[in-house]
């Protein structure tokens, strides 16, 4: 079993266990972890969540954004036929509201509000409301509702987060990112993926600038013991001068790993790096065109 594949499976197992999505499953595959490793694995998502919940009274923001919303539980509210979930510091919930200060625009908050219509055994239906909020007053200044952004099936959305890297593509033009992380439910075919979308405030709205670029992907297949293959793709973004502003240069790195049982019974892994390539995304003055092969559909 490759190291990357094991990490994918371990992360999937933790997410499934903590979200109670793997009822009846055991932690046998991660039983060999040291206490320090387990603590680190559990603390990393906790620290990440803390960064995405730094906006104080989320309830006050929700009340201004949805004045007709009504309480529907201890940490849930209803607006029409949609359910909003307030974040909890003690649990992981990919449907909970996410909030972060926009470092590039002091005084503004970034808020992502999943609007869930239905949660089934193997699927979820819902939209995502993305807001830029005035921090002193909690008043929404820019807003965009993204239909079906929370829809999933056997490949589940495991986390929503903000990316506040300085995506500057013109004079006084700054975008922020929304990342969606996905995780598969199959043990023999582990899968994880992260997509990035960029949004720019325009008037009272938010304009999509970049749609669902796949920035990370890990996928593989193995026999649940040793033999298997994994492909890990990573894409790193850099702003570069273009004809109509700043283009995006995407550095793509791919690593292929193969694992086989050796004659001595040990599991042997071979990693092979594919030659990196660079993909240029041109800015047309309003948005970037993403090739279909590197975009989630």
Where are these regions (language model features)?
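Acidic/hydrophobic-patterned starts of short beta strands in beta-sheet-rich repeat architectures
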Residues: 106-115, 168-182, 244-254
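Solvent-exposed N-terminal domain segments of exported/luminal and surface proteins
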Residues: 51-125
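Bacterial N-terminal signal peptides that target proteins for export
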Residues: 8, 18-36
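Cleavable N-terminal signal peptides
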Residues: 37-38, 48
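Acidic, small-residue rich beta-repeat scaffolds with periodic aromatic anchors
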Residues: 49-85, 189-207, 211-297
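Short N-terminal edge-element motif at the start of the domain
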Residues: 107-170
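Structural signature of eukaryotic scaffold interfaces centered on beta-propeller domains
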Residues: 95-105, 158-171, 237-244
């Amino acid at each position: 079993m490759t190291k990357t594949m094991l990490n994918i499976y371990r992360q999937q197992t933790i997410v499934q266990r903590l979200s109670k999505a793997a009822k009846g499953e055991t932690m046998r595959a991660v039983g060999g972890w040291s206490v320090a490793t387990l603590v680190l694995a559990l603390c990393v998502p906790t620290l990440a969540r803390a960064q995405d919940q730094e906006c104080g009274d989320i309830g006050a923001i929700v009340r201004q954004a949805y004045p007709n919303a009504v309480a529907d539980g201890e940490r849930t509210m209803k607006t029409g036929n949609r359910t909003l979930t307030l974040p909890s510091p003690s649990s992981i919930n990919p449907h909970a509201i996410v909030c972060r200060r926009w470092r590039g625009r002091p005084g503004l908050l970034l808020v992502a509000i999943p609007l869930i219509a239905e949660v089934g055994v193997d699927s979820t239906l819902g939209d995502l409301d993305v807001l830029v909020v005035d921090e002193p007053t909690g008043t929404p200044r820019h807003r965009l509702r993204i239909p079906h952004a929370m829809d999933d099936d056997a490949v589940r959305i495991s986390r929503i987060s903000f990316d506040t890297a300085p995506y500057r593509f013109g004079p006084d033009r700054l975008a922020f990112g929304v990342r969606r992380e996905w995780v598969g439910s199959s043990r023999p075919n582990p899968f994880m993926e992260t997509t990035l979308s960029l949004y720019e405030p325009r008037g009272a709205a938010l304009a999509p600038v970049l749609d669902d670029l796949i920035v990370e992907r890990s996928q593989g297949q193995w026999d649940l013991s040793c033999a298997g293959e994994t492909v890990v793709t990573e894409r790193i973004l850099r702003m570069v001068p273009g004809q109509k502003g700043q283009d995006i240069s995407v550095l793509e790195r791919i690593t292929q790993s193969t694992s086989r049982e050796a004659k001595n019974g040990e599991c042997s892994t071979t990693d092979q790096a594919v030659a990196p390539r660079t993909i240029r995304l041109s800015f047309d003055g309003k948005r970037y065109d993403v090739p279909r092969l590197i975009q989630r559909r």
